[in-house]
Structure formats: structure tokens, C-alpha cells
Regions:
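Glycine-rich, histidine-containing beta strand-loop boundary motifs that form or position
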Residues: 92, 117-120, 176-177, 212
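Active-site phosphate-binding strand-loop segment of PLP-dependent enzymes
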Residues: 153-213
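Flexible glycine-/small-residue-enriched beta->alpha junction loops
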Residues: 124-147, 165
Length: 218
């Protein structure tokens, strides 16, 4: 039984099969682009592992408090090299994105500081972390205030409103890249880069935190 006969026996007509093949042909350039990105990212990771001289000893188990866990420390150096950052925190104890965001916020904000969300209201899961919903050990309870700048009606950043909202107490701005449950498009890396450059021009010492869903950049 050849392929066409097999599909026919499954109730798939020639018309449907030809349509599927036409769609695949149309998508070939997209698939090729994805494969190219994957290849480049793989090379980036391999380069980061070579730079940090990953070897068999880094995969050995450790005991005790983990102060000398060279495998863990080197893994974080590999992440930092791959993502071109000063440092990285990679731990199995960080169970989800909200957990990672809570760590980043708690580590960078002190009592009297202000967190400014400049892409509208963050995900619902952050409400208790910030203190928008009453919760023990929230940033609000810790003495950190919260302010928010909504996006424009077209889903773009409101630069004049952001500039007005920045003040002496503003320590950190929060940018949510994903559209979440909204209908706007997700922000591109270029758009976020322009936004951060603008915020830095207004307040050079501001900390810019980007919620990239599966990756947190500070």
C-alpha cells in the first residue's frame, strides 16, 4: 500500500491531501527560518559551555550546604554567557514565573521605594506579590509603593505618561512583554529596547525589569 492508498483507506481524500501539501510548501520558508534560529541558539549554548569549560566534574553530585557546588555555579555562568548578562540565577527551587518575578522584585526593592508598571496591570498572579490584593509578606506590607501607567488604546507605550510618572521614589519599572489575556500584540525586543533607552534617559539609575514569561531580564 502506497501513501495515497493509505490516506484513502483512512478517509482522507486527494483534495485534502493536496491542500495539506500546498500549505506545507507555503510554510517551508517559515520552518527554515525557525530551524536557522534553533541552529544559531544551539551554537550560542555550545559556545557558552566551551567558554566556561564545562566538563564531567560539573555533573557530579554534591552534598552539604552547596557552598562549593561548582556544577551549579558553572551552570549559572553558562546561562549568563549565553544571554550576555552579568550574572544568572538558575535554581530548581524557583518553581514558576511568578516565583522568579517575586524574587527579582524583593531583591531590588526596599521600604520607601516605588515600583512602576509601565505596560499596564501585570498578570493576576502578581497582584498578591505586589499587594494589590491583600496578602502577607507582599511588597505593600514591606513598605514598597506601586504605580501604574496604562498602555494607549492602540496597545503602544505611553511615553509622555511614563515620563510624568517617574519620580524620586521610583526604583524599578516593570515591563510585561507578553500580551497575556489582552488583545494587543506582544512587544518586540526592539520596542522594549527603545522603551528602556527612553526610561534611562529620564532616570539613568532606574532598574528596568522585563517579564519575558519564561525568562526574567534585569
Amino acid at each position: 500500500m502506497n501513501r495515497d492508498e493509505m490516506y484513502l483507506s483512512l478517509g482522507v481524500s486527494d483534495k485534502v491531501l493536496q491542500f495539506g501539501e500546498a500549505v506545507l510548501d507555503e510554510l517551508k520558508p517559515r520552518f527554515a527560518g525557525i530551524e536557522e534560529i534553533a541552529e544559531l541558539n544551539q551554537a550560542k549554548v555550545i559556545g557558552a559551555m566551551q567558554k566556561n569549560r564545562v566538563n564531567a566534574t560539573h555533573f557530579a553530585a554534591s552534598t552539604g550546604y552547596g557552598y562549593d557546588d561548582e556544577g551549579r555555579d558553572n551552570l549559572e555562568r553558562v546561562y549568563a554567557s549565553a544571554f550576555h548578562t552579568e550574572a544568572a540565577l538558575v535554581r530548581p527551587q524557583i518553581t514558576c514565573g511568578t516565583h522568579a518575578l517575586a524574587i527579582a522584585l524583593s531583591a531590588n526593592l526596599l521600604p520607601g521605594d516605588e515600583m512602576l508598571a509601565i505596560s499596564g496591570k501585570p498578570y493576576d498572579t502578581l497582584e498578591e506579590v505586589i499587594g494589590l490584593r491583600e496578602s502577607p509578606c507582599s511588597l505593600k506590607e514591606y513598605g514598597v509603593s506601586y504605580a501604574q501607567v496604562d498602555l494607549r488604546e492602540d496597545g503602544s507605550f505611553d511615553f509622555p505618561a511614563i515620563e510624568r510618572a517617574l519620580n524620586d521614589k521610583t526604583k524599578l519599572i516593570h515591563i510585561q512583554r507578553s500580551k497575556g489575556y489582552a488583545t494587543r500584540p506582544s512587544f518586540s525586543v526592539e520596542e522594549i529596547g527603545q522603551l528602556i533607552a527612553f526610561c534611562k534617559s529620564c532616570k539613568p539609575d532606574i532598574i528596568c525589569m522585563v517579564d519575558n514569561l519564561s525568562l526574567i531580564h534585569i
